């Protein structure tokens, strides 16, 4: 009798995705982040569900309801901090996953890559609307500043902003709709992630060499299931350490002050995972220009497959491209640091130079070096 996992209509899908899936024998720990992102998503949905049972999306009670969760609900403080720091872990995994894709040329699977970019945008939108919900000072002013950027759109900008706000400022209507978005988006992310996986399994995984590995595959289970479990344990350990020892390390103290439309915080800044984009936005002294640069800083990922000039897929055997890749990482870390600094000398000029370098590396230097490496290999 054939095993039920190979015949049952539902089990067959799971079997082909997680058990009998042929996988390259040489994929490194950088390939762990996909499963870790799945784990993060499940954790966020579960903790978020329990938080939503006690949260009230109303300007007069939102802040108090979060305080109530932390003080009065059984393990409410734990669920709340798991959810907040879980978002940080989510973005760490997300950026590592994208970095892996850039380094090893995984972006050559175009459908998978494009859905991945769409997933990134959806996760960023979810994190943004979620940050507004506690209704602290940074929640309110972050929402005001970021939604206001849409007013830079010619002709329809102002109307669009007021439509999103549901009034003439960020108020009760805004909070209610942001809660609705924050609740629905993770399920959209889940659906997109399934499609992401579907397209990946059409081609099979890439591997560190970038060379087709059809002749050297091993079953996903037990080899990569055990490897994924190790990654998951390390992720959970890190998340628990962060949550139980320094739960507010990555948060903003301003968000412990209830939202006050009459008092602007000295430094309005987003959570750490958006700082690089925020620095790019601020580095252009023009509203529309800044908004376009902000959008392009993320959407540039869509154009990466078109900018591939090297005849080798992976950077594994391309030392000059590796140098530029790590320069890009250093540049992004610089932008992240600048995004958290006040707008004054020398931070302004450093941010502008880092922003120029970011686009220069991706659009000009990396494709040029790819061509040079081809020449060096007489290809």
Swiss-Prot record:
Cofactor: heme b
Pfam families hit by this protein: Cytochrom_B_C, Cytochrome_B
A cellular-component GO term for this protein: respiratory chain complex III
Binding-site residues for a ubiquinone, renumbered to this chain: 201
GO biological process: one example: mitochondrial electron transport, ubiquinol to cytochrome c
Alphabetically ordered keywords of this record: Electron transport, Heme, Iron, Membrane, Metal-binding, Mitochondrion, Mitochondrion inner membrane, Respiratory chain, Transmembrane, Transmembrane helix, Transport, Ubiquinone
Topological relation to the membrane, as annotated: Multi-pass membrane protein
Cofactor remark from the record: Binds 2 heme b groups non-covalently.
One MF annotation (Gene Ontology) recorded for this entry: metal ion binding
Locations listed in the record: Mitochondrion inner membrane
InterPro entries given in the database record: Cyt_b/b6_C, Cyt_b/b6_C_sf, Cyt_b/b6_N, Cytb/b6-like_sf, Cytochrome_b, Cytochrome_b_C_euk/bac, Cytochrome_b_N_euk/bac, Di-haem_cyt_TM
UniProt keyword annotation of Heme present: yes
Misc. remarks from the entry: Heme 1 (or BL or b562) is low-potential and absorbs at about 562 nm, and heme 2 (or BH or b566) is high-potential and absorbs at about 566 nm.
Subunit structure: The cytochrome bc1 complex contains 11 subunits: 3 respiratory subunits (MT-CYB, CYC1 and UQCRFS1), 2 core proteins (UQCRC1 and UQCRC2) and 6 low-molecular weight proteins (UQCRH/QCR6, UQCRB/QCR7, UQCRQ/QCR8, UQCR10/QCR9, UQCR11/QCR10 and a cleavage product of UQCRFS1). This cytochrome bc1 complex then forms a dimer.
Family, similarity comment: Belongs to the cytochrome b family.
Function description: Component of the ubiquinol-cytochrome c reductase complex (complex III or cytochrome b-c1 complex) that is part of the mitochondrial respiratory chain. The b-c1 complex mediates electron transfer from ubiquinol to cytochrome c. Contributes to the generation of a proton gradient across the mitochondrial membrane that is then used for ATP synthesis.
Protein's name in the database: Cytochrome b
Organism: Steno bredanensis (Rough-toothed dolphin)
